[in-house]
């Protein structure tokens, strides 16, 4: 079940990447959306590693996901301004 969820996120990221290459005039918005999905996948990987190892591993993926989400929020804000 969890693997299907992760694979669907990967497919969505690939579709968004194809759209970004086809419509280059709108890439600033699409790149921010792709960063949100990338952050979600990294966050889920971090939670999965943390659950498997039962220690501090996976924290790097979670921190990286938060960083990616903050960059995407900055991208959305700059696009709106």
Curated annotation (Swiss-Prot):
Membrane topology: Multi-pass membrane protein
Cell compartments where the protein resides: Cell membrane
Principal subcellular localization: membrane
Transmembrane domains' residue ranges: 4-24, 61-81
InterPro entries per the UniProt record, alphabetical: DUF3953
GO cellular component: plasma membrane
Superkingdom of source: Bacteria
Keywords: Cell membrane, Membrane, Transmembrane, Transmembrane helix
Pfam family, one: DUF3953
Name assigned to this protein: Uncharacterized protein YczI
Organism this protein belongs to: Bacillus subtilis (strain 168)
Organism ancestry: Bacteria, Bacillati, Bacillota, Bacilli, Bacillales
